[in-house]
UniProtKB/Swiss-Prot annotation:
<dbReference type="GO" id="GO:0008270">
    <property type="term" value="F:zinc ion binding"/>
</dbReference>
<dbReference type="InterPro" id="IPR000571">
    <property type="entry name" value="Znf_CCCH"/>
</dbReference>
<feature type="region of interest" description="Disordered">
    <location>
        <begin position="471"/>
        <end position="490"/>
    </location>
</feature>
<dbReference type="InterPro" id="IPR045072">
    <property type="entry name" value="MKRN-like"/>
</dbReference>
<dbReference type="GO" id="GO:0016567">
    <property type="term" value="P:protein ubiquitination"/>
</dbReference>
<dbReference type="GO" id="GO:0000209">
    <property type="term" value="P:protein polyubiquitination"/>
</dbReference>
<feature type="zinc finger region" description="C3H1-type 1">
    <location>
        <begin position="35"/>
        <end position="62"/>
    </location>
</feature>
<keyword id="KW-0469">Meiosis</keyword>
<dbReference type="Pfam" id="PF18044">
    <property type="entry name" value="zf-CCCH_4"/>
</dbReference>
<dbReference type="InterPro" id="IPR041367">
    <property type="entry name" value="Znf-CCCH_4"/>
</dbReference>
<dbReference type="GO" id="GO:1990116">
    <property type="term" value="P:ribosome-associated ubiquitin-dependent protein catabolic process"/>
</dbReference>
<feature type="region of interest" description="Disordered">
    <location>
        <begin position="318"/>
        <end position="346"/>
    </location>
</feature>
<feature type="region of interest" description="Disordered">
    <location>
        <begin position="504"/>
        <end position="532"/>
    </location>
</feature>
<keyword id="KW-0862">Zinc</keyword>
<feature type="compositionally biased region" description="Polar residues">
    <location>
        <begin position="323"/>
        <end position="334"/>
    </location>
</feature>
<dbReference type="GO" id="GO:0051321">
    <property type="term" value="P:meiotic cell cycle"/>
</dbReference>
<keyword id="KW-0677">Repeat</keyword>
Length: 583
């Protein structure tokens, strides 16, 4: 059927040509699309429109600045709220801030940075002044240099106000640059220098400015470049910036081991505030046996001797105290050493004080003990003895290295002389391999071993018998025959019971009574020990010969019966094998 015959009249043909689904309809017959020239092109505003003059949207920037008033907001039912793209104008003419005000109106068509940075178009400083983004981006290199010079002058003024020497200030900033952001930026509550000083007066905590205030006229602006200039200061000495400075000779720093423990700790509460405290260990936590905050399990052994001295050794790492010089070996093991303490007191350290470390070091062996749970008592004791052996060697090394540091470390973890335990290992436990079991049989308890030995005979007989073992075959194959009314192993099917009983009765009838008497009544009943004289012995021998002759005659008569029993046993074995093959 052709198209001409498809239409009944001309009106149907017109509808066909005006249809949007007709590909043969011309552009003149189609309805004109809705004009979108009043809608600004978002791609042109961002500089990414590729349509050019053929774009159906408007490329006029003036139209983009003039926002259409939201009619829904005037009615009170705009569901977009502050995200609405139209202007929200109140009845009195005031405009409510919406997304329409986010882009800058002055630099609208040329830059796409203003659109992408609309939520952060303005920067609010500490004195609540709105600074445009362009003022920060238009700073030249010369202005940066002048700013750094001004900040360097401010640094010198700040150093005069701080109670510590200038060399310590440089070292402290290098210290903060080498560690993991120990000093962070001061919050809004400490934004002004006056508030920082008031805070230090109230709490008695020494404060170090995290970054410096750069003064520009009457207003103060916090500049992050001061922190950069401080961290960029290079230390010429590769060993330690504290050597030869006033840091070691200053009276504000301790010169005793105990005072040194209370001087370098930076409490976690001061993180994020730029405040450094003087306490490395809290005395309350030391009395309670708590773990120091900056010591971990792997690092405590290497840092323990270093805390006993009041100097910093020459290493490239400024952020961590290191090991102190070793104690000369000429010091006797039984001699005590005296060190100056706090307020004129004297610290006396003897090798016996190292016993406080035994509970500390025994904690390091807890995972080994836990891993040995569930094993035999012998292996558990060997693990425990091995851990105590390592404890003894560890403490002996610490004793030869620095006896004072080890005793102080033990006292800081809450151990005392009274609570110490002496883990002396006897010589009989020198060979730990003797406690390793050779087989699983040694791991059984005495009750389990006795129970297993009591079932030994049954295990042998049951293992030698088949799963489909019958009464007769179990009596023939087993070393310990059982009566016919009991089973040795899993019994066979019930259809063989009558078969076995019938052939058993036939075999008993065919066997002479003398053979049954010999088999059921052994010669042990007439042993010579029950007789009193030689006459009885001779009579017994005669009876034995008589029995022997009777047995020979009865065996010849019973050949036929034994052949019948053997044939039945062969048949039984074949049927049992067939049962096993089917299973």
């Amino acid at each position: 059927m052709t198209k001409k015959n498809a239409f009944k009249n001309s009106e149907d043909m017109k509808k066909y040509h005006l249809s949007e689904f007709n590909s043969e309809a011309t552009s003149l017959t189609r309805p004109s699309p809705k004009s979108l020239q009043h809608v600004p092109c978002k791609f042109f505003r961002q500089g990414t429109c590729t349509s050019g003059k053929n774009c159906i949207f408007s490329h006029d920037l003036e139209l983009a600045t003039e926002k259409t008033i939201c009619k829904y907001f005037q009615k009170g039912n705009c569901k977009f709220g502050s995200k609405c793209a139209l202007e929200h104008v109140l009845p009195d003419g005031r405009k409510v801030k919406t997304r329409a005000f986010a882009p800058s109106t002055t630099a609208m068509g040329s830059s796409s940075q203003n659109i992408s940075a609309a939520p952060m178009a303005n920067i609010i400083s500490n004195n609540d002044k709105i600074l445009p983004m362009t003022t920060m981006a238009s700073a030249t290199a010369s202005e940066e240099k002048n700013r750094i010079k001004d900040e360097a002058l401010v640094i010198k003024k700040e150093e005069s106000n701080v109670a510590i020497p200038s060399e310590v200030t440089v070292a402290a900033n290098a210290f903060s640059a080498s560690t993991e952001d120990v000093y962070s930026i001061v919050g809004d509550s400490l934004s002004k220098k006056a508030s920082v000083k008031d805070f230090s007066d109230v709490t008695g905590i020494e404060t170090i400015p995290a970054y410096v205030e750069a003064t520009n006229g009457s207003s103060t602006v916090r500049s992050p470049h001061a922190k950069r200039s401080l961290s960029s200061i290079s230390v010429k000495s590769s060993t330690s910036p504290f050597s030869g400075s006033k840091f070691l000779s200053s009276s504000s720093y301790p010169h005793t081991p105990e005072a040194h423990l209370n001087s370098n700790h930076i409490s976690p509460a001061s993180f994020g505030s730029g405040i450094r405290t003087r306490n490395i260990f809290n005395p309350e936590s030391m009395s309670l046996g708590l773990k120091p905050p900056i010591l971990n399990r792997s690092y405590s052994a290497s840092m323990a001797p270093g805390f006993s001295m009041n100097t910093f050794t020459a290493t490239g790492n400024l952020g961590r105290p290191t090991k102190s010089p070793s104690v000369p070996t000429s010091v006797g093991s039984n001699k005590s050493r005296k060190f100056p303490g706090i307020n004129g007191s004297t610290l006396t350290a003897t090798p016996s004080s190292l016993e406080n470390l035994y509970p500390l070091s025994s904690r390091r062996s807890v995972p080994n003990l836990i891993s040995s749970l569930g094993t035999s008592p012998s292996t558990f004791s060997s693990q425990f003895l091995k851990s105590t052996d390592r404890t003894h060697s560890f403490t002996s090394k610490l004793q030869s290295f620095n006896p004072v540091g080890t005793s102080l470390l033990a006292s800081s973890l809450g151990t005392s002389q009274e609570d110490s335990v002496n883990y002396d290992i006897p010589d009989e436990f020198a060979n730990e391999e003797d406690f390793i079991p050779n087989s699983l049989q040694e791991l059984l308890t005495p009750e389990e071993l006795e129970r297993k030995m009591s079932h030994g005979d049954e295990a042998v007989s049951s293992s030698s018998a088949s799963r489909f073992m019958s009464k007769v075959s179990s009596n023939l194959n087993s070393g310990n025959p059982t009566p016919y009314n009991s089973y040795n192993g899993t019994p066979t099917s019930s259809r063989f019971v009558a078969f076995f009983d019938r052939h058993r009765q036939e075999s008993e009838k065919a066997t002479p009574p003398s053979l049954n008497k010999v088999s059921q009544e052994p010669l042990t009943a007439t042993t010579p020990k029950n007789l009193g004289n030689l006459t009885a012995i001779s009579e017994t021998l005669e009876n034995g010969q008589t029995l022997k002759s009777n047995m020979a005659s009865s065996i010849e008569k019973s050949k036929t019966s034994t052949e019948v029993v053997a044939s039945y046993d062969t048949t039984l074995d074949e049927e049992t094998q067939f049962q096993m093959d089917e299973a």
